[in-house]
Each structure stands twice: as C-alpha cells, then as structure tokens.
Amino acid sequence: MKILYPGTFDPLTNGHLDLIERAEKIFGNLVVAVLENTSKTPTFNLERRIIQIKNSLSHLPNIEVISYSGLTVDCANDLKANLILRGLRAMSDFEYELQIAHTNKSLNNDIETIFLSTNTNYSFLSSSLVKEVAKFGGEINHMVPPPVEKDLKEYFK
C-alpha cells in the first residue's frame, strides 16, 4: 500500500510535519508530493521547497519526497498509490477536501482519500499565515521546522 500526501507546501509548516510524522507511524511509509502549481507564484521555487521538506524530514527515513504537476490523481496513478492523505483543520477544510476526494474518486475508482484531523496545537496554522507573520518580523519558530524558519527569515529580511 502506497500513501500519497500532496500539497504545495509553500512553506511546510509544523502542522504538515506533524501530519507526516503521525501518518508514518500509522502506515510505515509515505510519499510527500510537492505540487508545481503553475497558476500561483510561490514564495519558494519547487527545488527550494523540496530541499526544505527533505531537510525537515531527515529523521524519517521511510518518507519519500517527489515533485509533480497536473492532477493529484494522475500522480497517484503514476506511483501506484491507492491512498491520498489529507489533513483537516476545520469544518471548512472538510467541505473542500471532500469535494476534491469525490472528484478524485470519479477519475479513478481505486483511489481512496484518508483524512487525519490536525493536532490542536497546529489547527490555526496555514502556509499563508506563516508567511504573513514572517513578513512582518513575527516569531515563527513554533510554526515551522528550523530549515523553513531559516529560509523565511532570509527571504523577508
């Protein structure tokens, strides 16, 4: 069984990291798929985001980090992954993620989506919120892993 955890991760937050660590305990392995989203201009380019994630996950040897573009369901098909992992912070996340899960299922009936609720310590976090705090010099060390914190401070100085 291969599990795919897709996202833009611009940047990776401690909420993402917590979800990855918990999923690794449950499933034993995981593929973190970093989306190259051509409709958005990311703060960090794809290569930098992958480096940040790999450096943040160095303590988890069973985690693979890849990049992809296009549909997540196509990425899952290419990897022969039959499970897509998504995190839920609030009810609004559930409504959005359920719609995506149903769309993926309509494109490939063998794909299942598994939802893990976010640890309450991180339920307020989003990548855009972290960038906003970093932009104005706020403390972010409790929001992101050290490799990401370093890059954000450098980016916004």
UniProtKB/Swiss-Prot annotation:
Annotated site location: Transition state stabilizer: H16
According to its UniProt record, where is this protein mainly located? cytoplasm
At which positions is substrate bound? T8, K40, T72, R86
What catalytic activity does the UniProt entry give for this protein? (R)-4'-phosphopantetheine + ATP + H(+) = 3'-dephospho-CoA + diphosphate
Any one Gene Ontology MF annotation carried by this entry is:
ATP binding
Give the EC number(s) listed in the UniProt record: 2.7.7.3
Q: Which cofactors does this protein require?
A: Mg(2+)
Which amino acids does the record list as binding ATP? T8, F9, H16, G87, L88, R89, E97, Y122, S123, F124, L125, S126, S127, S128
Keywords in alphabetical order, please: ATP-binding, Coenzyme A biosynthesis, Cytoplasm, Magnesium, Nucleotide-binding, Nucleotidyltransferase, Transferase
The reply on keyword Nucleotidyltransferase is: yes
Q: Output a single Gene Ontology CC term carried by this record.
A: cytoplasm
State the pathway, as annotated in the record: Cofactor biosynthesis; coenzyme A biosynthesis; CoA from (R)-pantothenate: step 4/5
UniProt-listed InterPro entries: Cyt_trans-like, PPAT, Rossmann-like_a/b/a_fold
Indicate where this protein resides in the cell: Cytoplasm
Biological process according to GO: coenzyme A biosynthetic process
Annotated Pfam families: CTP_transf_like (PF01467)
Give a short account of what the protein does: Reversibly transfers an adenylyl group from ATP to 4'-phosphopantetheine, yielding dephospho-CoA (dPCoA) and pyrophosphate.
Q: Which family does it belong to?
A: Belongs to the bacterial CoaD family.
* NCBIfam families xrefs: coaD_prev_kdtB, cyt_tran_rel
Q: What is the annotated quaternary arrangement, including any partners? A: Homohexamer.
Q: What is this protein called?
A: Phosphopantetheine adenylyltransferase
Which organism is this protein's natural source? Prochlorococcus marinus (strain AS9601)
Q: Which gene encodes it?
A: coaD
